[in-house]
Amino acid sequence: MVKLRLKRCGRRQRATYRIIAIDVRSRREGRDLRKVGFYDPIKNQTYLNVPAILYFLEKGAQPTGTVHDISKKAEVFKELRVNQTK
């Protein structure tokens, strides 16, 4: 099963995160299937590759709680529902 989750990057005490699609059995720093976004909690910046996220969600990927909250704030799930009703 594939999950959308955060991968820690950056320096000590200055964490940034990549949002990645990764196999659920892999460790946090393991090899990812694809990078689908970026999140910096200190600067409060977020970049999401929405088509890639929608692709993985349609294939059955499950977002973690934090990734779900970030995606919800960016209104990614509204686009998912629009695509499903077509």
UniProtKB/Swiss-Prot annotation:
Signal peptide: none
Superkingdom in the source lineage: Eukaryota
Annotated coiled-coil segments of the chain: none
Main location: plastid
Any GO BP annotation: mitochondrial translation
UniProt KW Plastid keyword: yes
SUPFAM superfamilies: Ribosomal protein S16
Localization, UniProt: Plastid, Chloroplast
Keyword terms of this UniProt record: Chloroplast, Plastid, Ribonucleoprotein, Ribosomal protein
The keyword DNA damage is assigned to this record: no
One Gene Ontology cellular component: small ribosomal subunit
Listed GO MF terms: structural constituent of ribosome
InterPro entries: Ribosomal_bS16, Ribosomal_bS16_CS, Ribosomal_bS16_dom_sf
Family as reported in the entry's similarity comment: Belongs to the bacterial ribosomal protein bS16 family.
NCBIfam families xrefs: S16
Protein's name according to its UniProt entry: Small ribosomal subunit protein bS16c
Source species: Nymphaea alba
Annotated gene: rps16
